[in-house]
Amino acid sequence: MRQAPVIHLRGLDSSIGHALVERIFRTDAHLVVPRKNYRDILQRYATELEFGECELHAADQLDFASGHRLMLIGLGPFDEPSDGENGFEVDGLEIILTAPAHLGIEVDTEWVDSLVLVHDLLPRVKDSTWGSSLFNQWMTQLNAHELPSLKGETKHWWVSDIDVADAFVRMLMSDEAFPGQLKVSGRRAWSQAQTIEELSLLHARTMAGRTGQFSVEHLTAAPTPSIEVKSLIVSPSTPMSREENSQQRPDLSPLHDVLFRIDGDGWRPLVPIRTALMHALVDYVQ
């Protein structure tokens, strides 16, 4: 009989951390969280815990053991007083570190089993670690009634934190080990101009909704932007200039392959970017 997996999460004070908790509560896993987050999660998800199959534990209630999985989210620190002298050095404990790619941090991967870099995430709350500084700049300009400005010619491969969390949980709930290195992003390239156009329209509609001052322009259906879909496999010619590299989408084939082995679906983000942009801007106009 299959045993419910034990998943330890550290670094939950982020949009992607919240999304992971929400998604795991739809499974039968044992979820282990830091003591400081335990009571808030217990209260916030009381209904899911009462009627669902997932069980919640604080870190000092369930120790690391062989076969458990530990996902570290963000930049840390990740240690808990209950970890003891050995910390994460437990035989058979799979350690996955996931970090925002845009920060360009160098990680010593000797102590982790997998390093996952997430590109162009659209978090549903303001997040200085995971959110794009360029997105933050655009929202600041829009709120000041200014036209968002372009910065270079970089493209973005936007992806919702909901889709990223879903992919992570599909892997965490499976018997498949996380690949040693993994990159996550959306599959479609968005130019800055396309993103600004879409974001400006959504911002205008949101502000009109708050004030009740709608115009025909706000209520007219916006055309769907022409977005290019790229192959999952990226095989760049070398050497590449910095500008060429900024146009190159992360190689998603390892992510797609492991998800395909798990359930046959592969990497197919379901949240439309227009919806993800709407989720992302809401916290800026509260």
Model-derived segments and spans:
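N-terminal Rossmann/SDR dinucleotide-binding element
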Residues: M1-S66
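Short, well-ordered alpha-helices that flank and scaffold nucleotide-derived cofactor binding pockets
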Residues: H18, E22-R26, D166, R170-M173, ...
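Conserved Rossmann-fold NAD(P)-dependent oxidoreductase catalytic core, especially the SDR/UDP-sugar
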Residues: A59-D60, F64-V125
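NAD(P)-dependent short-chain dehydrogenase/reductase
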Residues: E106-L172, L199
